Amino acid sequence: MQVLSSLKTAKQRHRDCQIVRRRGKVYVICKSNPRFKSRQR
């Protein structure tokens, strides 16, 4: 999982990527291609 300062490009890497807020952090999850998972500080 990458830790990025901005998730704008991370959500556009794959069309299945979606942004989720969990416990005050912002995550990008991608079920079809999990290598695109990322988290914002």
UniProtKB/Swiss-Prot annotation:
GO terms for cellular component: ribonucleoprotein complex; ribosome. GO terms for molecular function: structural constituent of ribosome. SUPFAM superfamilies: Ribosomal protein L36 (SSF57840). GO terms for biological process: translation. Pfam families: Ribosomal_L36 (PF00444). Keywords: Ribonucleoprotein, Ribosomal protein. Belongs to the bacterial ribosomal protein bL36 family. This is Large ribosomal subunit protein bL36. It comes from Neisseria gonorrhoeae (strain ATCC 700825 / FA 1090). The lineage of its organism: Bacteria, Pseudomonadati, Pseudomonadota, Betaproteobacteria, Neisseriales. The gene is rpmJ.
